[in-house]
Each structure stands twice: as C-alpha cells, then as structure tokens.
C-alpha cells in the first residue's frame, strides 16, 4: 500500500506543462514554494512572472536570497517581483544583502 501511494504521489508531480501559467496553476494562497537561482543567475523568471500574474497571496518562500529590487521598482528581479506586489508573507533566506 505504501509503495502504491508513493508511486501515485510521484506520478502526480511528473506532469509536463506546456506553459509557465499551467505549471503554477496549482499554487494557492498561503502556499510554501522554493525558488532557485542566486543574484541574476539561474532564476526561474518565467515561473515567477506567472506566479506574479496569478495574484496568489501570503506565500512562504524558501530561497537563498530574496532577489533584487530598488525603491522605484526599476531593478526588480527574481523574487523581488513578488515582494514588490506584496505576495510574499514570509521569506526564508540565507542572504538578504541586495534587496531593498
């Protein structure tokens, strides 16, 4: 029984999505998400933009840094785009030196 449930669980995550919007459609208000990248490299911007456009709120985000941003919003990058729209309620990071 355990193996079957584990297989079902894994199978549910083995979906190929054709768009970033499809990939994030299951993210609901209050979700916990993790994001990769550091500084300007390896950041999943297509997925983060899709999350931003979905208007989900109260996210808890785990990442090594909260992205980039400035007071005017001209340099927002990475998780900074979600911080700008106040979609992140709690941030768990190891480095926060570059964000506003």
Question: What is the predicted function of each stretch?
Answer:
Residues 2-100:
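Conserved alpha/beta enzyme-core scaffold
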